[in-house]
Amino acid sequence: MQEQYRPEEIESKVQLHWDEKRTFEVTEDESKEKYYCLSMLPYPSGRLHMGHVRNYTIGDVVARYQRMLGKNVLQPIGWDAFGLPAEGAAVKNNTAPAPWTYDNIAYMKNQLKTLGFGYDWSREIATCTPEYYRWEQKFFTELYKKGLVYKKTSAVNWCPNDQTVLANEQVIDGCCWRCDTKVERKEIPQWFIKITAYADELLRDLDKLDHWPDTVKTMQRNWIGRSEGVEITFDVKGYDNTLIVYTTRPDTFMGATYLAVAAGHPLAQKAAANNAELAAFVDECRNTKVAEAEMATMEKKGVDTGYKAIHPLTGEEIPVWAANFVLMEYGTGAVMAVPGHDQRDYEFASKYGLTIKPVILAADGSEPDLSEQALTEKGVLFNSGEFDGLAFEAAFNAIADKLAEKGVGERKVNYRLRDWGVSRQRYWGAPIPMITQEDGTVLPTPEDQLPVILPEDVVMDGITSPIKADPEWAKTTVNGMPALRETDTFDTFMESSWYYARYTCPQYQEGMLDSKAANYWLPVDIYIGGIEHAIMHLLYFRFFHKLMRDAGMVTSDEPAKQLLCQGMVLADAFYYVGENGERNWVSPVDAIVERDEKGRIVKAKDAAGHELVYTGMSKMSKSKNNGIDPQVMVERYGADTVRLFMMFASPADMTLEWQESGVEGANRFIKRVWKLVYEHTAKGPVAALNVDALSEDQKALRRDVHKTIAKVTDDIGRRQTFNTAIAAIMELMNKLAKAPQEGEQDRALLQEALQAVVRMLNPFTPHVCFTLWQELGGEGDIDNAPWPVADEQAMVENTTLVVVQVNGKVRGKITVAVDATEEQVRERAGQEHLVAKYLDGVTVRKVIYVPGKLLNLVVG
């Protein structure tokens, strides 16, 4: 064994061994308990960033630990390879998205291998290959036949100059990112999957997910947004149709003083034909973004349509306004407004001078003061005719019943959740497998024409999708009749909704899934990824699993038992102000800093001498130029060091502050372990451990070893507090470094301890542990070694520490047998010189003894 720790030599050698031995390839084995450990698959952007490294290190630690417990562990990896960034990069680099993507995959695959992640590479998938997306296309056609897929018009961002649809992120301040033309909202036909048909089950089954973070479950509950209310029908004077609104507060119905409809509602459109102000407003709304965050903060505007609706219970006429806070996509595109008891309605009514009628009493039974704001709390009704005096529930039921009796109201359960629009007017995605015949009939692509292959050898102009630009591509025939293919592609969330299941059978050619393999491995035991995926990906992931279950492919109801959301990786951020007042962000690697005595940064400059402004720690990002390249760190310190720092610096679900001093600390620790093993093995063969022959000190050290094994096992396995597990191993290492190494049993004990330490560190630092295990004479590869088991006998305390006080002041501590009597403890205390001097020439008047803990001698 060489004296110096040289990661660059060890790591490549061990990685080659894993590759040649195919160490992490697994197959179904009914005789073993399975464990499926999955990290969210990466987008092949070109380089790994520290967020990836953190995510995949956590996954690898869990997978290696479970493997050492003797389980059959599947840990696969693949590439979420379709998506918009590839189109932008292709235009910029004058290439096509496919070669750019495949080059990135090759580069990043090598980076993953360099970090020593134990993946089953035989199961690698790239979602942009026809071998993968053909099954997604087939499944979509089956969902269509089941009535779970439909087409309807929906609003998109449209650039009139480029004549193209833009993704939300391509709209900058309301303008096209390429040509700066003002973006319009345009209605185009798009494909949808009926996720709403599963809303109740998606909501209900959240209760089964005991090992998912509550924050994620709450976000999904709110996103699905189940509510119980009443759908009410209003007649409108001079308008051919009725208006239907939904409310969760029918108790406030007698306070409804106006209705509001979306600018896109047929009533508003009709009224706008003879109303220039309204027509201009409808036009303005058409080009407004409808992201929910913006809806909440934007100014509420409206125009009176001139129509009057009839209140179904009072017969009063109430105005109908067009308002920008009502969306056609949500509900019926019309809402009833009760300004006395809803803050948004109150602000709108105050702005436009509409009637505000209170119908709920304040908590103290008085009429509410509505001079400043609405009263939104529930309470007792007044000003409501026959319903006066009723509290919320009674009023809800009485008014709902009355409306139903008159045929103008119906109790309804509503959801905020909207059906999933899966059409994208982009090129780099899986083609949607639908065709339109000459007579307008829409059909799913026949099975013998699947997969519909996306051509990869294309020229990108950055404006129009190559498959839309090439009229020949869309031409096909069905039953000998000409037809046109759909030129939209799938939302890339489609691919990431079922990849986890395909990993169980990536070579299977008979269908989407091999049920036998899928049901052996599924559900996923732990799924690791960022909380930013809480509603979109993680909801579609759950939805797709239920679709596959209902198609008879899987038997479980949910795709993953446990979800672990890792925290973000933060780094210092610095900038200097340029000549034009712009901020120039400087990489923390290039910042020369001065710190105060507490280690805080007080001054910074860069190599060019610019005074830098330090903005604190923030998420590593391109925009702040504060990303640290994992590759540079691996080259400098080795993969094991980077992995150890990642797992030690912070709990897995909390933010991690990147500090190179911490990386250096992790590196020093690995060197200490190496040095101790080197010194130990250099002394030659070791005798067998004879537990019965150990001295008290040796027993105490062995107790520490086995208590550490018990703690680390609990920290990694049950608590998943990986940082405290590492801290416990470090603490034990400090004791081992100080332990005597001369006697035969000293060395035998150190041998047992080091073999335990190396196995406990193996999930975190697998390369160095692989090597040290061999040096310590471990059996076989450490990858197949069992996890150390704590010896219960060794952990039994046969002595205990008793604090000795004289007149209530601590004067010493003594070690006594666990079963020592009070007399024996007193006798032992008298022999302790620190205590004895306080007992010299005095009389012990009283003895207070707390067995095994405290002896207090009262003297006078």
From Swiss-Prot:
Main location: cytoplasm
A GO BP entry: leucyl-tRNA aminoacylation
Signal peptide segment: none
Source taxon at top rank: Bacteria
Keyword Coiled coil annotated: no
InterPro entries to which the protein is assigned, alphabetical: aa-tRNA-synth_I_CS, aa-tRNA-synth_Ia, Leu-tRNA-ligase, Leu_tRNA-synth_edit, M/V/L/I-tRNA-synth_anticd-bd, Methionyl/Leucyl_tRNA_Synth, Rossmann-like_a/b/a_fold, tRNAsynth_Ia_anticodon-bd
E.C. code: 6.1.1.4
GO molecular function: aminoacyl-tRNA deacylase activity; ATP binding; leucine-tRNA ligase activity
Short sequence motif named 'KMSKS' region, residue ranges: 619-623
Family indicated by similarity: Belongs to the class-I aminoacyl-tRNA synthetase family.
NCBIfam families: leuS_bact
Name listed for the protein in its UniProt record: Leucine--tRNA ligase
Organism from which the protein derives: Salmonella paratyphi A (strain AKU_12601)
Gene: leuS
